[in-house]
């Protein structure tokens, strides 16, 4: 058998074409064969014999690396080579036939979930909030009043389709239990998972998803006892005792349901946007990516908080300061010009002639267009969503059909997080598909930012003055992260509402004039000759008190 280099150097070694092919086809087949030979030569080959040794010695198989072995370029028909190939094939067969099992003894390793998609189908979404408000109204104590005013995080009860038998370490930050249920309701007090949470745990290997063949009343009795399925899985007898056929029949773990594969979990839990009990593939990929990065992620409320209607456009005009001296009071008594910063004249100069002591009044005259600084730009404003302020916004763009909505609230790992009382989110995530969504318009971005609560800059940035100007502008007063999903490749883009109208740069000019040190006083002249020479007076004055000039030369006797 010729080597690849021989085929390239001597074309005569190429097998002749068949009689049914033409010369052109023969040339093409030879070139194709040459390309395939080169690709096969360059392709990395894994020696599964090296992996077989680690397979038999350690349990942490996933932590080991399959290394490449030495590769023979051709078969030379020896028994040693045939034995090596057979050993590698057997090792590959053992690796591919490995059965992945869950560790039932470890509380952090395994948990079983049951798929009940229609259990919360007709349940009111605000059930917990209604019960909390009712309990606060019936109670008379201060604690009850606080409970009545407390807002619970969104439960999304109609989308919770997976019921957990018990919790483990992986599911401590996932799932919610529906409180306030009647005592005779099955599975009372147990935690339910959203589709993205369940699928994430299945992929992670921490959840075994089962399809129930019995009703939820049989799997999870209403008396709150141990679930029948869990009792069937864990035998009441000890490991050393002999089990009879009757015990094995009673403890049949497949009596109440069947386990589902990962493909079946994807088919049941992945769907279109707005489909109850399912999540889109783009949102699940973003959720899974953030969870694997160590963040805590919860779903955002479907209906955001009510929009404040009292938000109005503000201008950069500042109210006139009150006179603080007799001179300024007398000047203020003089008749003023008919024009004002808020009502400019129809013709003539924007800045009327006069005497101005600061740049503030001049720039207020030049400020004709109103600024769109929201009321959230003030540190005393409420942390509530605002009404979109763009007068040109199209209602159809900011309606329910717009894809630009907040889908997830994200918390850093260092943030103290609880599922029932989560703190304000560190990030607001909007998931966008790069395939189906175009570049957002101004009205869509304005509506998206208006749906997010105010996120003011840090206190030291607000009090930092001009030195912290760029930090305040970069952070903004509202910000949302767009998670652009391009067929599984996720990029994050940050959109913020910058407070440019709040940064009045002309005030810095007044600070320099009024706060700068004064240097002045005319200097005496320099004498020369005898002691009775007289120097001339230098020229003083200037802005802020000028520096005295150099004196003239005196006359001697």
From Swiss-Prot:
<feature type="compositionally biased region" description="Low complexity">
    <location>
        <begin position="370"/>
        <end position="381"/>
    </location>
</feature>
<protein>
    <recommendedName>
        <fullName>Probable tRNA-splicing endonuclease subunit tsp-5</fullName>
    </recommendedName>
</protein>
<dbReference type="InterPro" id="IPR024336">
    <property type="entry name" value="tRNA_splic_suSen54_N"/>
</dbReference>
<feature type="compositionally biased region" description="Gly residues">
    <location>
        <begin position="517"/>
        <end position="527"/>
    </location>
</feature>
<feature type="compositionally biased region" description="Gly residues">
    <location>
        <begin position="538"/>
        <end position="549"/>
    </location>
</feature>
<comment type="function">
    <text>Non-catalytic subunit of the tRNA-splicing endonuclease complex, a complex responsible for identification and cleavage of the splice sites in pre-tRNA. It cleaves pre-tRNA at the 5' and 3' splice sites to release the intron. The products are an intron and two tRNA half-molecules bearing 2',3' cyclic phosphate and 5'-OH termini. There are no conserved sequences at the splice sites, but the intron is invariably located at the same site in the gene, placing the splice sites an invariant distance from the constant structural features of the tRNA body.</text>
</comment>
<feature type="compositionally biased region" description="Basic and acidic residues">
    <location>
        <begin position="131"/>
        <end position="140"/>
    </location>
</feature>
<keyword id="KW-0819">tRNA processing</keyword>
<feature type="region of interest" description="Disordered">
    <location>
        <begin position="131"/>
        <end position="152"/>
    </location>
</feature>
<feature type="region of interest" description="Disordered">
    <location>
        <begin position="1"/>
        <end position="36"/>
    </location>
</feature>
<dbReference type="GO" id="GO:0000379">
    <property type="term" value="P:tRNA-type intron splice site recognition and cleavage"/>
</dbReference>
<dbReference type="Pfam" id="PF12928">
    <property type="entry name" value="tRNA_int_end_N2"/>
</dbReference>
<feature type="region of interest" description="Disordered">
    <location>
        <begin position="370"/>
        <end position="403"/>
    </location>
</feature>
<comment type="subunit">
    <text>tRNA splicing endonuclease is a heterotetramer composed of tsp-2/sen2, tsp-1/sen15, tsp-4/sen34 and tsp-5/sen54. Interacts directly with tsp-2/sen2.</text>
</comment>
<comment type="similarity">
    <text>Belongs to the SEN54 family.</text>
</comment>
<dbReference type="InterPro" id="IPR024337">
    <property type="entry name" value="tRNA_splic_suSen54"/>
</dbReference>
<feature type="region of interest" description="Disordered">
    <location>
        <begin position="514"/>
        <end position="557"/>
    </location>
</feature>
<dbReference type="GO" id="GO:0000214">
    <property type="term" value="C:tRNA-intron endonuclease complex"/>
</dbReference>
<feature type="region of interest" description="Disordered">
    <location>
        <begin position="225"/>
        <end position="252"/>
    </location>
</feature>
């Amino acid at each position: 058998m010729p080597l690849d280099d021989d085929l390239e150097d001597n074309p005569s070694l190429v097998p002749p074409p068949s009689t049914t092919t033409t010369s052109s086809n023969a040339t093409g087949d030879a070139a194709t064969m040459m390309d395939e030979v080169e690709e096969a030569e360059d392709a990395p080959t894994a020696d599964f014999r090296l992996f077989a040794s680690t397979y038999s010695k350690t349990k942490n198989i996933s932590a080991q690396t399959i290394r490449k072995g030495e590769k023979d370029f051709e078969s030379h028909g020896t028994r040693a080579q045939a034995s090596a190939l057979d050993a590698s094939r057997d090792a590959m067969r053992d690796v591919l036939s490995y059965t992945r099992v869950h560790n039932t003894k470890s509380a952090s390793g395994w948990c079983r979930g049951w798929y009940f998609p229609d259990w919360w189908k007709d349940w009111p979404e605000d059930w917990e909030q209604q019960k909390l408000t009712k309990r606060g109204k019936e109670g008379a104590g201060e604690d009850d009043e606080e409970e009545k005013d407390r807002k619970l995080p969104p439960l999304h009860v109609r989308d919770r389709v997976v019921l957990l038998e018990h919790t483990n370490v992986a599911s401590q930050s996932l799932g919610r239990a529906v409180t306030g249920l009647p005592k005779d309701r099955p599975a009372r007090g147990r935690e339910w998972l959203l589709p993205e949470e369940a699928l994430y745990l299945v992929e992670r290997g921490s959840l075994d998803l089962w399809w129930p063949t019995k009703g939820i009343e049989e799997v999870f009795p209403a008396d709150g006892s141990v679930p029948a399925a869990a009792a069937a899985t864990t035998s009441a007898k000890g490991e050393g005792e002999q089990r009879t056929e009757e015990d094995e029949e009673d403890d049949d773990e497949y009596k109440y349901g069947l386990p589902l594969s990962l493909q079946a979990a994807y088919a049941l839990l992945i769907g279109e946007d707005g489909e109850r009990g399912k999540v889109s593939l783009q949102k699940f990929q973003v959720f899974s990516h953030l969870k694997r990065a160590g963040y805590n992620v919860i779903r955002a409320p479907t209906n955001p908080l009510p929009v404040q209607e009292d938000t109005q456009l503000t201008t950069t005009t500042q109210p006139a300061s009150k006179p603080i001296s007799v001179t300024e009071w007398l000047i203020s008594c003089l008749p003023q010009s008919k024009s004002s910063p808020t009502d400019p004249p129809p013709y003539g100069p924007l800045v009327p002639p006069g005497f101005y002591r600061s740049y503030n009044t001049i720039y207020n005259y030049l400020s004709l267009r109103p600024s769109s600084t929201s009321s959230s730009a003030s540190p005393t404003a409420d942390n509530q969503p605002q009404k979109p302020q763009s007068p040109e916004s199209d209602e159809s763009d900011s309606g329910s059909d717009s894809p630009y909505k907040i889908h997830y609230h994200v918390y850093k790992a260092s943030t103290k997080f609880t599922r029932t009382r989560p703190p304000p989110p560190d990030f607001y995530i909007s998931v966008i598909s790069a395939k189906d969504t175009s570049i957002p318009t101004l009205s869509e971005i304005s509506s998206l930012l208006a749906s997010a609560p105010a996120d003011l800059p840090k206190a030291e940035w607000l009090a930092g003055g001009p030195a912290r100007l760029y930090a305040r502008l970069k952070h903004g007063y509202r910000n949302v992260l767009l998670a652009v999903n391009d067929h599984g490749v996720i990029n994050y883009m940050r959109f913020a509402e910058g407070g440019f109208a709040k940064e009045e740069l002309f005030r810095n000019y007044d600070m320099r004039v009024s706060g700068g040190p004064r240097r002045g006083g005319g200097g005496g002249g320099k004498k020369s000759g005898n002691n009775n020479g007289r120097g001339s007076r230098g020229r003083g004055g200037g802005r802020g008190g000028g520096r005295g000039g150099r004196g003239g030369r005196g006359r001697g006797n």
